[in-house]
From Swiss-Prot:
CDD domains in UniProt: RING-H2_RNF126-like
Zinc finger (RING-type): 224-265
Role, per record: E3 ubiquitin-protein ligase which accepts ubiquitin from an E2 ubiquitin-conjugating enzyme in the form of a thioester and then directly transfers the ubiquitin to targeted substrates. Promotes polyubiquitination of target proteins.
Gene designation per UniProt: RING1
Pfam families, A to Z: zf-RING_2, Zn_ribbon_19
Full protein name: E3 ubiquitin-protein ligase RING1
InterPro entries referenced in this protein's UniProt entry, alphabetically: RNF126-like_zinc-ribbon (IPR039525), Znf_RING (IPR001841), Znf_RING/FYVE/PHD (IPR013083)
Swiss-Prot/TrEMBL keywords: Metal-binding, Transferase, Ubl conjugation, Ubl conjugation pathway, Zinc, Zinc-finger
SMART domains linked: RING (SM00184)
Length: 338
């Protein structure tokens, strides 16, 4: 066993094998340091003397205790939280860190029929391939943002007029029921659950057929992005307004279900008046469009719709202000941008 955590007795003698380790006590709902001296029995919390503990390996030892303690009087408040003057602007960087500090993952998708998790919500040890709910949620939120989603987090019953405080590790806010509540809300707002409507027939018919030339084969548009087969010189391909090329038999079935380019999500007009109204509202919010409503859109007309949804989170610090009533559930509302 490593001697890094060895405890030195009062007389200066080194007590071999005695170590201090951080644990999370589920009874006290906080991190504690437990002195372990083999071959003793299972570790117990020095505060409540209970054994409902999980060893905690802090990935960032300079960050201090990362666990959220709902009782801010038990340990110094400033050691646990970061003060945020602008809650919404400051919350997003915590949820969406830079790519250099985020593990790359494939597209995340949440099953809305089974959003709950089983097993411990924090895995400081064990199987490196074990499911990590916090990484999963973070990657899923990044996927939503990359597809144009605007995510607004609302803290319910916030008693502070000067902003509010969040855990240094935002993942620690969502533990137990709070974590499952967040997953449920994300599942209800997953754009993959609904998708975009089909492209209009007139827009599909207006897509040009282009002859594949050597210049195409030497460019980034040298293969169909659906079937991934290389184009052959002299053959024809359908071209989207964004200039991406596809085999006709690959693109048309997709456009009969979704109006977006499979690569860049550039959107064709639809026959859905409600959806078109949201598109116009989104474009008006971002600076308007050029007024061209025909099937052929100009290259500068970005029809990627920014989906917006709101995630309501309960105010967790009961000692700092009133929390939601026990029967209250966080609600998520799909917001139109017009």
């Amino acid at each position: 066993m490593s001697s890094d955590g060895n405890v030195t007795g009062g007389g200066g003698a080194n007590t071999v094998g005695v170590t201090n380790k951080p644990f999370f006590c589920y009874q006290c709902n906080r991190t504690v340091n437990v002195t372990i001296s083999p071959p003793s029995s299972d570790p117990t919390c020095p505060i409540c003397n209970e054994g409902f503990l999980e060893e905690y390996d802090n990935p960032n030892p300079n960050q201090g205790s990362g666990f959220l303690n709902p009782n801010p009087n038990s340990i110094p408040f400033h050691d646990l939280f970061l003060t945020l003057s602008d809650p919404f602007a400051s919350l997003l960087p915590l949820l969406f860190p830079s790519s250099s500090s985020t593990t790359t993952s494939s597209s995340a998708s949440i099953d809305p029929n089974n959003p709950s998790l089983s097993g411990p919500t924090r895995s400081g040890r064990g199987d490196p391939f074990a499911f990590d709910p916090f990484t999963f949620i973070q990657n899923h939120l990044n996927d939503l943002r990359s597809s144009g989603a605007q995510i607004e987090f609302v803290i319910q019953n916030n008693p502070s007029d000067q902003g509010f405080r969040l855990p240094a590790n935002i993942g620690d806010y969502f533990i137990g029921p709070g974590l499952e509540q967040l997953i449920q809300q994300l599942a209800e707002n997953d754009p993959n659950r609904y998708g975009t409507p089909p492209a209009s027939k007139s827009a599909i018919e207006a897509l040009p057929l282009v002859n594949i030339t050597k210049s195409n084969l030497n460019s980034e548009f040298n293969q169909c992005a659906v079937c991934m087969d290389d184009f052959e010189e002299g053959t024809e391909a359908k071209q989207m307004p964004c200039k991406h090329l596809y085999h006709k038999d690959c693109l048309l079935p997709w456009l009969e279900l979704h109006n977006s380019c499979p690569v860049c999500r550039h959107e064709l007009p639809t026959d859905d008046p409600d959806y078109e109204r949201r598109v116009r509202g989104a474009q008006g919010t971002s600076g308007g469009n050029d007024g061209d409503n025909s099937g052929q859109r100009s290259d500068g007309d970005n029809r990627t719709v920014e989906r917006s949804f709101r995630i309501s989170l309960p105010w967790p610090f009961q000692a700092r202000g009133p929390g939601p009533a026990p029967g209250d559930n966080a609600e998520t509302r799909q917001e139109d941008l017009d």
